[in-house]
Each structure stands twice: as C-alpha cells, then as structure tokens.
Amino acid sequence: MQLHKFYFQGMMLPLLQTKVWKFLMSQIGNHAFMQKFVELLNSASPKLAVELIAPDAVFNSVITGREHTGPSGYLEILAALKAGFPDVRWELQELVGEGNVVAARFNISGTHLGEFQGIKPGGKEVRISAMNLYRLKSGKVVKEFNQFDNLSLLWQIGVYPPME
C-alpha cells in the first residue's frame, strides 16, 4: 500500500491508499471544481465554460425552457438569466459529492432590471435557491440536473400576488 501525507490543521498525518483516502481526495477535488464553477456562474466567462464543461454536455434549463449543449449552450442559459437580472450573484451554500456526481445548493440574488421569461422589468430585488446535480467526467460537467425556485422568483417580481 502506498503512503500519502495529508495535512490537517498544520499537522502531517500519514494515510494509506484506501477508500478513505480516495474519498477525501474526491471531496477536495469536488470542492475546488465547484469554487471554479461558481466563478463561471457569476462571470459567464467563455474561457471558464470551455475549461469546465464538456463539448457534448447536456443541460435542460428551466430558465430558457429548452435543452442546451456544451459550453456555448450553458453560456446561453447564463445570458438569459443575466438579461433579466444583470447583477445576478450565485453563492454556494452546500456541497456533497461522491465519485463523479456533485450536488450543490445555491442562493441566487439579483435585481429584475431586464425582461425575464417575457416579464417586463420591475426593479425588484430577488433571492431564491437552487439545487443542482452535476455529473462529471474527466474533470468536466457532462450533465446538469437543476431545481431552480422559479415560482418564488415569479412571486418576488410581482407576477403572482404575495403569499399571506
């Protein structure tokens, strides 16, 4: 068995090449990947999109209501969201991963300053949550499943009357 050095709170701990070691390394890798992915969500950088998304990745978007493929397709989704909420910010709240699957919970905030899903801007600030499940292959997203709190967003921008 191979011995690895793992540092925890400044102490070096020897770990054997075990399932525990592989699990720890996958968690560290998943966290680093998602930090970079949040950067993509907030910047809509084409360079990051190519780095993090496989060319044949598939995305079914509740934002646009259709399927998108690859880095350019994902950028279309982000552009549709930014068109309605130019100051949109994604914040990673929780992350769980196992092997090539990563689940992430986000808070999303922004101001409705542009048209979104056919709804004229009203200038209202919104804060919603999203749960996304990412399937990774060779360090890139190949599939995303998402649950975007669209109903709450529509309430907050005034499409539906406030809940009492």
Segments and roles (model prediction):
Residues 10-12, 16-164:
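C-terminal and inter-domain tail/linker signature
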Residues 1-3, 13-14:
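Short, low-complexity intrinsically disordered segments enriched in A/P/G/S/L with frequent Arg
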